[in-house]
Amino acid sequence: MTRRPVSRKRRATHGTGPGEQSDWDHSAHKRKRLQPEKKSLVFYLKSRELKPHNDSTYLHLLRGHAACTLPGILSEREFHLGNLNKVFASQWLNHRQVVCGTKCNTLFVVDIQTGQITKIPILKDREPISGSHQSCGIHAIEINPSRTLLATGGENPNSIAVYRLPTLDPVCVGDGGHNDWIFSIAWISDTMAVSGSRDGFMALWEMTDEVVNKRDFQHGLSRVPVYSHISHKALKDIPKESSNPVNCKVRALAFNGNNKELGAVSLDGFFHLWKAEQTLSKLLSTKLPFCRENVCLAYGLEWSLYAVGSQAHVSFLDPREPPQCAKSVYCREQGSGIRSVSFYEHIVTVGTGQGALLFYDIRAQRFLEDLTGSCREGDLLKLNTGKGWLNHNEMWMNYFSDIDSCPNAVYTHCYDSSGTKLFVAGGPLPTGLHGNYAGLWS
């Protein structure tokens, strides 16, 4: 008996044309039939090699394999941001949109498919800020665990501004807590966030149901966006451990949700640990192994480690271990500093002031090497950011006119939920230079 041939052709589905902007119509997506999830070539090849005992172990192994394989095959696509100055902070909103904050105090969303930039109105204090006020820009953007609220800086860089997700409608402004710029923010629960400031204090803010519901009620009565103003629930100062209290500025925060502990790095070269629940209670302070330019901090939940960036090293701290047990790795970026750091699986991604991305394997305790064959054996895998945009201003004319461009410091980077896309942004490292860089590595 001969088999009848079976046609495997399928009707083409109607989709959005290339370059078109899609709206945030969640109800429309619910009505559509879900398409089968696409698996990468790496997924299928690894699935033949591995025979796990259960799905969770299987997926964990695949994610770990992808984490150390993908950096070597990532390619860059730059975005044009106009004349914005230095992107300091970024977070993924969804699979195609990233929200960013800049030194020129601009909050915007970039669509990674179309490259379209949408600016978001920044929120103001109760009282107008003085005309002589100089803004340092937006240094922090953080999303709460349920991804319903986003916290960042306001028009006044001393204040914290909270927006609702996914609409980015304003919710409230926390003002009056700091008298200097906010450098970092960390959510310690769905409704409570901590801000760390250059004034040496950490402020605890609570977004109560009353605040959120009040905003909803007012918004229903007016077509003009309205928002509440809140005061801090607690205010704690960083211990003045060094001989120069002026340097006790809170530069970076990272939260350990399992132990309810908040790590903080101050510019005097100390790491501080706080119990963070309904208030902040100090647990310890310890001197960092390398204490110059400690401007970034991340927590790796799976490894129970804090990673701290310095001028040329990344130090790994386990609060349960004595300070002398801290391990530090040299990043071969002497002088430019480590500007951003993050954990994804067992890979720590490091962004430098010279516009490079490095990848450290915690399990192997070494940086990933370049295996493309284009470099010498033993050379580190290094992704270099593109040219970006540079304003040829007076500073450039006086000191940098002999060069057309300069490296873009990686002030911020973040992986999407799949771990296969890496958004990278920043700008020129010298203070007086005006420029920007943003790119998607995938």
Swiss-Prot record:
One of its GO terms (biological process) is regulation of autophagy. It is found in: Cytoplasm; Cytoplasm, Cytoskeleton, Microtubule organizing center, Centrosome; Nucleus. Pathway: Protein modification; protein ubiquitination. Residues 1-13 have a biased composition (Basic residues). Keywords: Cytoplasm, Cytoskeleton, Nucleus, Repeat, Ubl conjugation pathway, WD repeat. The keyword Nucleus applies. SUPFAM superfamilies: WD40 repeat-like. The keyword Membrane does not apply. GO terms for molecular function: ubiquitin-like ligase-substrate adaptor activity. One of its GO terms (cellular component) is centrosome. Residues 1-31 are annotated as: Disordered. WD repeats lie at residues 132-173, 177-215, 245-284, 333-370. Substrate-recognition component of a DCX (DDB1-CUL4-X-box) E3 ubiquitin-protein ligase complex of the DesCEND (destruction via C-end degrons) pathway, which recognizes a C-degron located at the extreme C terminus of target proteins, leading to their ubiquitination and degradation. The C-degron recognized by the DesCEND pathway is usually a motif of less than ten residues and can be present in full-length proteins, truncated proteins or proteolytically cleaved forms. Component of the DCX(DCAF12) E3 ubiquitin ligase complex, at least composed of cul4 (cul4a or cul4b), ddb1, dcaf12 and rbx1. Belongs to the WD repeat DCAF12 family. This is DDB1- and CUL4-associated factor 12-B. The gene is dcaf12-b.
